[in-house]
Amino acid sequence: MKNLTSSELRKIYLDYYKSKGHAVISSASLIPENDPTVLFTTAGMHPLVPYLLGEKHPAGNRLTDVQICVRTGDIEEVGDPTHCTFFEMLGRWSLGDYFKEYAISCSYDFLLNHLEFDKDKFAVTVFKGDEDCPRDDESAEFWKKMGVPEDRIFFLPKENNWWGPAGVTGPCGPDTEMFIDTGKPKCSDECSPACDCGKYVEIGNDVFMQYFKNADGTFSPLKQKNVDEGMGLERMLCILNGYKSVYETDLFKPAIALIENLSGHKYDESETVTKAMRIIADHIRTSTFLIGDVKGIVPSNVDQGYILRRLIRRAVRFGRIIDLPERSLSKIAEQYISQYQDVYQYLLTNKDRIVLELDKEEIRFSNTLQQGLKEFEKVITHIPTKTISGKTAFRLYDTFGFPIEMTEELAHENGFEVDVQGYEDAFKEHQKKSQAGAEQKFHGGLADNSEETAKLHTATHLLHSALMKVLGGEARQRGSNITAERLRFDFGFDRAMTADEIKAVEDLVNEQIKKNIPVVCEEMTVDEAKAQGAIGIFDNKYGEKVKVYTIGDFSKEICGGPHANNTGDLKSFKITKEQSSSAGVRRIKAVIGQ
């Protein structure tokens, strides 16, 4: 195996697939563009779903990238040797071009000949088949053809070797996963990569999207067969360098060294200190990327902002355990900005914002943390049972800013449980008028591709342009959510709009609607789009060519669509509400055609 740095591994991977005819594309934002079902980009394939479904990608049908991702389902697991909330995914795709044989040959060649993994320790898994879809004998035969012996090819069920669909229906298919045998003894005669005994460590997988799952549960062959390869950068570095923990890699070492200096503690002096430093290093890396993202997430009590707040406050709590001085979190973020700025330049561009938001949130929570911890100690000392009531948990949240997950974590550390349902009931009762609402959370993007949502999508472009004309350039989009009934649009602005400003924005939009202006879509290079003054998230678009939607001389944005044919289709535009979304972000709700 090659001992590599993170920079070397990124370069080797992208250069390899570039040599195989793949276009290198940029990482997308951590906030999905048009997917209202999730908070974050959680996998390399996430931004490419439209192209996996058949839409032509501007860069072609062979792509490769390093996609930044956030997964927060296991926040409480962070602190062990392997879990991270932020990670980079090395990925490559074939969009209706090559399929299993060439994909497998590339994976084998890259892993064994370029990264120099031991051929004698290499093992793979393939789909064993079930009543819905046949056994993936094709992949098994191609692995044999590459020289993998039959006793190191394992057939496993859907729970191990199948991807998708993302929803009830959609593209899906078998995958083949690649492993290295660590040399540990078998846990049983049936020991395989499906075990969690640690004998086998995954180093990559290829997903073969060849089926479409229908609403009735049946599967049909896809017209366009796709390949999606994924290899986690952090995990791969850990394995290649023989580390026991991802926190030993060069992605975390500088931050942990800084935490040691700031706290006066050594990383390996105790399990408690090691865990605390891992949590702080992970959570501040993720927070740095979320705040620095082109969509600029800030701590709040809803959606992405809530996750960000939860990460920062968890880091503050564990910082107290290791005597981390106040305002240390922003210093750790500055270390990450310096470390990543050559790869993700926007972190340096947004450095001031990152430092400001981290300092603000750390100071805000530090002021109540100690009081809250004292109150928690009183609670567990005096309650007669081992369950903290929902009302008490809500009081800790409402008075001291303890996210429910923090209260649960503290409770479990002390042998208590929390009545989470009771907390949720108390929260709903208190938050009936919460801007997030009780029934629908704001995740951003389009709810569907109906004619009405297409019109409302066009309305968001008109609104975006009108806001910047009335309020200035700071009023850039921070997020959007569109259903068939209304649009919701978040934008950067540090105060409530006046009645005159709201009317001015409405008048500007309605003026464009009355003009019945055609909505024109063109494909062009990113440089051409920039030269024409198009609004876009230039650090996070794919390939050399992009779609640009133009509405006369009023609006020009890089966008994936869909849109109305002309502005007259909207009939009219009305702002129904203007309110705060979070610190420095305002939210508008609006309707059309009424």
Residue ranges: model-predicted function:
Residues 1-594:
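A glycine- and charged-residue-rich anion-binding loop/surface
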